[in-house]
Amino acid sequence: MTNTPARACPLAKKCGGCQLQNLSYDEQLHLKQATAIRLLGRFGHVEEIIGMKDPYHYRNKVQAAFGVNRQGQIISGVYQSASHRIVPVSDCMIEDTVADQIIVTIRGLLKSFKIRPYDEDTGRGTLRHVLVRRGWRSGEILVVLVTAHGMLPGKRNFVRALLQQHPDITTVVQNINAGQTSLVLGPHSEVLYGPGYIREQLGDFTFRISPRAFYQINPVQTEVLYRTALDYAGLTGKETVVDAYCGTGTIGIFASRNAARVIGVENNRDAVRDAISNAKANCADNVRFYTADASDFLQGMAKAGEHADVIILDPPRAGSDERFLSAVTAVGPERVVYVSCNPETLARDLGYLTRHGYRVTRIQPVDMFPHTEHIETAVALVKNP
C-alpha cells in the first residue's frame, strides 16, 4: 500500500468520473482490496493489490465532448454521470496534462475557424468530440477530431494552426460519426496530418495505435499487469498460446518470446490490422492474428481437434459468456489466464470454469484506474488432473 493524501478536485461532485476521489490513495487501495476479497476470495487467496507510486495524470487517452453553454460559449469536457450534460474540464487530475492542453487549444480555435460544436437536439453543428492519445514513452501524439459529417471548414488551415501551438503532435485524423449514437467514434476516418497512428513502447516492444483500436490507458500499470499475466502463463518456449480478445496484440506479442506459437483472435478489424503491423515491427514471427469472434474461433479449434496449452483472455467489462467459456473448456488448455477489468463478471466466469474442470491458483488485483471504483485482476487457472 502507499500513503498518498487525497487531493481536492473542484469537479469531483459534478463529474462523477472519480468515485473515490474523496479518499486518500491508501484508503482507496484498502477498499479495492476488500472488494476483491469479497468477490473473489471464495476461489482462493487474493494477493495484495498493486498500486501506483504516483496515481495522477495516468490516462494516456483523453476524450472530450464539445458543446455550447447557456451563454453561447463553446465548452468542452466530460458528460456528467448518467447524462449528456457536459461538465467543462480544462485540467483533469487523472488525464495526461499535454492532452488536456491540446483540447483547450482546439476549443479556442473553433471560433476563429467558425466551427460549431454539434448539437444532439437540433442535429446542427460539426464537432462532436476530440480524442487525444499520447505515448507515455514515445511521446508521440494522436489527435482525432470527431465530426458529425465530412465537412470541416478550413480543415487544413485548422490543423496548421493547431500544429503551430503544439508542434509535438504526430498525427491528426478526422473521424466521421453521423449516427444518433452514444459511441464516440464512427466507422470512417480521414488522415489530415501524419501517418494516422502513433507508436508506443511497452516493455521491450513497440506497438502501433490507431484511432479505433483498443489500447490500455494506464501505461505504467499495464506493464505490471502483463508481466503478472505472463508469469501466470508459465511459458517454457514449447507452448501454443491463444490470446483471445487480443486487441492490438499486446499480450500475445509479450508472450511470443517465451512460446512456440501464439494465436491472437479479435473481432475489431482495425485492431487486428494494428496487431499484424505490431508483430512485424517486433519480429514476432511466431504470432498470427485473426479477425473473428473468439467463441466461434475456439469452437472451430475444438471441432478440428487443435490443441492450445495456454489460453489468455482479456474480455470487456461485460466479461465472457457461456458460449466462449464452453469453447475454452472444449479446447482444454492446461492453463488459463484471465485478465479482467470487472471483478463481478470475473467471479461469475470463474464460477463456470471451476465447475467445468479448472481450479484457481493465483489472484492478483492491480490498480489500473486510481480514484475510480474499477479494479483490474489477473487470475491463473490450471486444469484439474
Tell where the protein language model's regions lie, with residue ranges.
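Extended interfacial segments that mediate partner engagement and assembly in macromolecular machines
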Residues: 3-5, 19-119, 132, 136-137, ...
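Short cysteine clusters
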Residues: 9, 15-18
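Nucleotide donor/acceptor-binding cores
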Residues: 60, 139-141, 238-239
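Short, acidic/hydrophobic/Gly-rich beta-strand patch recurrent on exposed beta strands
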Residues: 77-80, 144-146, 275
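Polybasic, low-complexity RNA-engagement segments
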Residues: 84-85, 138, 147, 268
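Short helix/loop segment immediately N-terminal to the Walker
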Residues: 117-124, 241
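Short, aliphatic-rich beta-strand segments
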Residues: 132, 139-148, 206-210, 310
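Rossmann-like S-adenosyl-L-methionine
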Residues: 154-385
